[in-house]
Amino acid sequence: MKWRHDYMAEKKVEDLEMDLNEEELEESEVNEDKEFEELDKSEEENEVEELISTLKDENEKLNNEMEALKDRLLRTTGEYDNYRKRTDREKEGLYASACEDVLKEILPVLDNLERAILAKGDIEDLKKGVDMTLKQFKDSFKNLGVEEISTENGFDPNLHDAVMHVEDSQYGEKEVVEVFLKGYKKGDKIIRHSMVKVAN
């Protein structure tokens, strides 16, 4: 019996050792799992920190680019405003200069008309004065680059306004029969179309 008792005791010791080994093994596995979890957490934390750092750098870079673009936009807007103001002043100056040039040409004609009204004399003297004033007007127009629109080459809808049409065998088709109001142009720009009567 002793033998059996020793066997049982030995078996119990083996079972206890086995239980202890299993517990140690489980504890070791749990510790390893904890270490792996800590390693995983540590690696994840490092990755997250790197990602946060990268995103912060990119955000700072984008903010710098945005500030540079804002500054560029403000400068461009300011330059455009200055350009617009400068061109407005130049236009006003050109307009004033053009008006001044026209007035300088026309004022002497006005002076002569006033003198003609004040002059004492007969009809022939008055007619001679009006003819001279008319010549002076035409010279002023010539100096300003303004010329009368010709009707010698026939009717041209780009230059003439046909206010009347006539059937007359003495005139060719589209020939200007009569000028009611002379037209004028400066270069290629029409100031006023000639008002004419045209043959059909």
UniProtKB/Swiss-Prot annotation:
Pfam families listed in its UniProt record: GrpE (PF01025)
Annotated Acidic residues bias: 16-47
PROSITE patterns: GRPE
Cytoplasm recorded as keyword: yes
Gene Ontology CC: cytoplasm
GO MF terms held by the record: adenyl-nucleotide exchange factor activity; protein homodimerization activity; protein-folding chaperone binding; unfolded protein binding
Gene Ontology biological process terms, A to Z: protein folding
Subcellular location: Cytoplasm
SUPFAM superfamilies found in the cross-reference section: Coiled-coil domain of nucleotide exchange factor GrpE, Head domain of nucleotide exchange factor GrpE
Alphabetical UniProt keywords: Chaperone, Cytoplasm, Stress response
Primary location class: cytoplasm
InterPro entries in alphabetical order: GrpE (IPR000740), GrpE_coiled_coil (IPR013805), GrpE_head (IPR009012)
Transmembrane segments: none
Region entry Disordered, spans: 15-47
Record note on quaternary structure: Homodimer.
Purpose of the protein: Participates actively in the response to hyperosmotic and heat shock by preventing the aggregation of stress-denatured proteins, in association with DnaK and GrpE. It is the nucleotide exchange factor for DnaK and may function as a thermosensor. Unfolded proteins bind initially to DnaJ; upon interaction with the DnaJ-bound protein, DnaK hydrolyzes its bound ATP, resulting in the formation of a stable complex. GrpE releases ADP from DnaK; ATP binding to DnaK triggers the release of the substrate protein, thus completing the reaction cycle.
HAMAP family registered for this protein in UniProt: GrpE (MF_01151)
NCBIfam families from the UniProt entry: PRK14140.1, PRK14160.1
Family to which this protein belongs: Belongs to the GrpE family.
Protein's name according to its UniProt entry: Protein GrpE
Gene from which this protein is expressed: grpE
